[in-house]
């Protein structure tokens, strides 16, 4: 019975969003259902039925018969539109895709993105990532859904706080897959001797970040911003640390991670004392998180499988991936592991290049 109720609640949330009902209800006070029905063009009787079901979940309520008012929960969907975007993605995309997982499995001859549950649900050969690029609304909703699911904001900043940056003196740090300068600006304020190179894969983003005014001229002097395309060979060869953080919204695949590792192989080979810090969201190993946190992580993992036919990596799989990167002179090896103090799903690996001893 609870599952049936959740199904109807999701359908009602989609209905409210589709007809922009929530925006017609004042954040304070109430409004007559008839007025809302007139504004949105929906039948008043259906509106009342939807509101009364949602009220059982604390979303909207009737202070008096025929009157509609917001609760704290429903009001948040008006003041923070990303919540509504997330709800619409859940109802319009995530739910129907999940229901087509069995059909997709029956039809799959391989795990190409074009054979995903998403492609079955919407009868398309276009991969989900490509659809997000073309359709701004879908991309916005997916980003909002990812943030609400705890996807977009990982624990990498906390992880980096565990490192002994002061021991590096006036060394150069490269943030090689940056989405913004936020992390580097924070580190630059804390460690006034360090120098930074921020590499972004979008020329417009580079220009935008370059126009941001640092808090001091000293920080500006110690920070360079440059463009670097995904998987392009690392050209900065004299850094002490390379930070490799891949975007978390569309979580990186093993292929993407491997390509970035190989792109940094030459830089670490040229400087054996340099360290590459690989930070990426991971699927927690069974039983390492509390049940609610593990459930959220596994919901995200299954949603990713259904949308893209990609899955999250566990820590052991990530280490195996790193250990497989090599050239004729040596290979990568993991020299340290960092864990978030409150999330086994976030980790960072310290990686160095190990030369192969030459035969006498």
UniProtKB/Swiss-Prot annotation:
Keywords: DNA-binding, Nucleus, Transcription, Transcription regulation. Residues 33-52 bind DNA. It is found in: Nucleus. GO terms for cellular component: nucleus. Induction: Expression is up-regulated during banana leaves infection. Transcriptional coactivator; part of the gene cluster that mediates the biosynthesis of an emodin derivative that may be involved in black Sigatoka disease of banana. With MYCFIDRAFT_198930, coregulates the production of the PKS8-1 cluster product. This is Transcriptional coactivator MYCFIDRAFT_190109. It comes from Pseudocercospora fijiensis (strain CIRAD86) (Black leaf streak disease fungus).
